[in-house]
Curated annotation (Swiss-Prot):
It is an enzyme of class 3 (hydrolase). Its EC number is 3.5.1.-. Involved in pyrimidine catabolism. May facilitate the hydrolysis of carbamate, a reaction that can also occur spontaneously. It catalyses: carbamate + 2 H(+) = NH4(+) + CO2. Keywords: Hydrolase. GO terms for biological process: nitrogen utilization; uracil catabolic process. It holds the Pfam family Abhydrolase_1. This is Putative carbamate hydrolase RutD. One of its GO terms (molecular function) is hydrolase activity, acting on carbon-nitrogen (but not peptide) bonds, in linear amides. SUPFAM superfamilies: alpha/beta-Hydrolases (SSF53474). The gene is rutD. Belongs to the AB hydrolase superfamily. Hydrolase RutD family. PANTHER family: MONOACYLGLYCEROL LIPASE.
Length: 266
C-alpha cells in the first residue's frame, strides 16, 4: 500500500499518521498538513480500495484488516512508533491499531468517532445507501456535503462545493468498495474492548455534527481509561475542514501534551 511521508523536520521527529473517514482520501487532511509538518513527520495515504491504492475489497472486509494493512505498510517504511489522528472511520481504525499494536501506537486523536455506530448515524447511512442505489454515485456525492458541513458554511461556498463534487465523482471509489467499507464501519464495536486501550487519547468532536452526535464522543471518553475530550462549538462533521484554525490549535496542543505525558510515564 502506498504511503505519502513528509520529510522529518528534525532527527527522530515523532511520526503522525492521518487516517481519513469513509471517503478514504488522504487529501482530506490538507488543512492540517502545513502546521503538522513543522513539528512531525506526517504520513498520509489513500485507504485500500480508494485513490492511488486501488483494489477490489472482499465482502467481509473489516476495520481489523484496515488497521493491519496500514501497520504493515508503516513497518515496511521503517516506522515502528507513531501517533494516530483518525476521523470517524479513521478513528475506528486508530482504536483497532491501539488494541492490536499497543507497542507501536504512542497517542490517539479521535475526531468525531464512536464506540459503536449510533442509531442516528445508522439512519443517516441508510438514507445515503438508498440514494446510492437509486441515484448512483452522483446522488451519493451530491448528498455528502449535507452530512459534512454546516449549512451557512456551505451556502457561502457553492462554487467550491461544485468543484469538490466533480472531483469526488471523478475519483469515486466504486459502489462495491464503498458498501464494503461502510459495512465494516457499521459492524465495528469497541464497547467491550475500549478499556484495553492504554495509550493517551484526545477526543475532538463538534457540537453541530449532523452525522455523529456528540454523545458518541462522551461515551468514548467514559470508556477510554486515559482520555480527554474537547468540544468544538462549530464545524460540523468535517470540523477540521470548516474551522481549521480552531481544530489545528486543539490538535497541536493535544499531540504535544499527550506525547509529553506518554514520555513522562515511560
Amino acid at each position: 500500500m502506498k504511503l505519502s511521508l513528509s520529510p522529518p523536520p528534525y532527527a527522530d521527529a515523532p511520526v503522525v499518521v492521518l487516517i481519513s473517514g469513509l471517503g478514504g482520501s488522504g487529501s482530506y487532511w490538507l488543512p492540517q498538513l502545513a502546521v503538522l509538518e513543522q513539528e512531525y513527520q506526517v504520513v498520509c495515504y489513500d485507504q485500500r480500495g480508494t485513490g492511488n491504492n486501488p483494489d477490489t475489497l472482499a465482502e467481509d472486509y473489516s476495520i481489523a484488516q484496515m488497521a493491519a494493512e496500514l501497520h504493515q505498510a508503516l513497518v515496511a517504511a521503517g516506522i515502528e512508533h507513531y501517533a494516530v489522528v483518525g476521523h470517524a472511520l479513521g478513528a475506528l481504525v486508530g482504536m483497532q491499531l491501539a488494541l492490536d499494536y499497543p507497542a507501536s501506537v504512542t497517542v490517539l486523536i479521535s475526531v468525531n468517532g464512536w464506540l459503536r455506530i449510533n442509531a442516528h448515524t445508522r439512519r443517516c447511512f441508510q438514507v445515503r445507501e438508498r440514494l446510492l442505489y437509486s441515484g448512483g454515485a452522483q446522488a451519493w456525492v451530491e448528498a455528502q456535503p449535507l452530512f459534512l458541513y454546516p449549512a451557512d458554511w456551505m451556502a457561502a461556498r457553492a462554487p467550491r462545493l461544485e468543484a469538490e463534487d466533480a472531483l469526488a465523482l471523478a475519483h469515486f471509489q466504486g459502489k462495491n468498495n464503498l458498501l464494503r467499507r461502510l459495512n465494516a464501519l457499521k459492524r465495528a464495536d469497541f464497547s467491550h474492548h475500549a478499556d484495553r486501550i492504554r495509550c493517551p487519547v484526545q477526543i475532538i468532536c463538534a457540537s453541530d455534527d449532523l452525522l455523529v452526535p456528540t454523545a458518541c464522543s462522551s461515551e468514548l471518553h467514559a470508556a477510554l481509561p486515559d482520555s480527554q475530550k474537547m468540544v468544538m462549538p462549530y464545524g460540523g462533521h468535517a470540523c477540521n475542514v470548516t474551522d481549521p484554525e480552531t481544530f489545528n490549535a486543539l490538535l497541536l496542543n493535544g499531540l504535544a501534551s499527550l506525547l509529553h505525558h506518554r514520555e513522562a510515564a515511560l
